[in-house]
Amino acid sequence: MRLLLDTHLLLWAAGTPKRLSASTRKAIESPDNSLFFSVASVWEIVIKRSLDRPDFQVDAHLLRRGLLDNGYAELPITSEHALAVETLPPIHKDPFDRLLVAQATAEGMTLLTADANVALYPGPIRKV
C-alpha cells in the first residue's frame, strides 16, 4: 500500500514515535508499504516554525533528509493536486490538510492522519 503521512504523523514518527499507535508503527515499518511525505508538509513546518508554533520546532532540512534516508519518498505538489483541492467539500479550512487530501486522492494513496476533521473527507483516508 502507498501511504502518505500527514504532517503531525511525520513529526511524531521522526521525533516522538511513542505518540504513534502500535498499528500505525506497524504500517510504517511494514515492507509491504511504500511511505511518502508531501512537500506541503515541509512547507507547513517551515511556515509554522517561523510563527514560533511550539509543536513545529523542528529543523525541516534535517527532517527531510532523515525521511529520505529512511526510505520515504518525497511527493511534489503539482497543478493537478492544486486543482483537486477545488473539488473537496468545505469540511476543513486548513489549506495544508486540504492539499494532503487532494494529493492522496489524485495519486491513489492512503492518507494517514490523527486529525478527526481530516478523516471526515471522502476518499482514501485512514484515521490512526
Where are these regions (language model features)?
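Active-site neighborhoods of divalent-metal-dependent phosphate/nucleic-acid chemistry enzymes
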Residues: 55-61, 68-114, 128
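Phosphate/NTP-binding elements of NTP-utilizing enzymes
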Residues: 45
